[in-house]
Amino acid sequence: PYRQKKLDCIVPFSGGRDSCYSLHLIIKELELKPVTYTYDWGMVTDLARRNISRFCGDLGVENIIIAANISQKRKNIKMNLKAWLKSPHLGMMAMLTAGDKHFFRYVELVKKQTGINLNLWGTNPLETTHFKAGFLGIKPDFDEDKVYSHGLSKQLKYHSYRFKAMLESPGYFNSSLWDTLSGEYYRSFTEKNDYHHIFDYWQWDEETINNTLIKEYDWETAVDTSTTWRIGDGTAGFYNYVYYTVAGFTEHDTFRSNQIREGVITRRQALDFIFNENRPRYQNIKWYLDTLGMNFEEVIKVVNSIPKLYKE
């Protein structure tokens, strides 16, 4: 019912590993005619932009870019990072990535302007990270079938816990608050029609994905990490450094743990992976803090001084 004469679907496109492979599947396997959509909120790296350009060029696909007020978005992140540094709280790390949630708002605009209803996402179910909300004191819902939690009661609970944490550092009550809350609204409260996730129907296989992207499309990898996950995200290096320094693990640990549970890799393989993946991404972190106009040494000194949640 979704196939049309010209374009069939919208593909939200970050230039990352999963969205790129999704586009490959949509064109090569499903034989659909997509248009891609990218939301630039100020933390899309040059690496991601190059991969977006490379992939869309090779596959002959149009890329619609909706750019936020980049300077304002970065100012918002800076205000929230300053507030976080005054009272470091692992449960509040999500405030630093709140600006990208308007991705969900503008996909509706793209649907309206193109007349295309179907949007196919490359969200990987193995990416679920319960610990991020867990650091706020929220217990995981293992029956949740989505990467992002939805529903009024769940969101009200989440925001009540976050509000209490915000009181510990009043700097969070700044001009970015409306942007944060409205982004959360579009992500978690608005009705999602004709949204489908490719990897709900197609097996996600890391080796196949990496080989396809790199060998067939000359997809560019990062120079400061062995992983291909989130390498186009300007925030990932910093928040994973914080999690690893304070808690002793990162989202890479949870990702590999999910793979173990699925029987995809062994525990020994997972430990070998995270030994490399959890190493600090100096270049990514430096870019992030420089872009925000923050002093690298001062910020890292605060992070390193946070009391650890583990014993050596």
What are these regions (language model features)?
Residues 1-8, 25, 29-312:
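Nucleotide-activated chemistry modules centered on ATP-dependent adenylation/adenylyltransferase
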Residues 21-22:
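Hydrophobic positions on the alpha1 helix immediately C-terminal to the Walker A/P-loop
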Residues 9-18:
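Short, glycine-rich nucleotide/cofactor-binding loops
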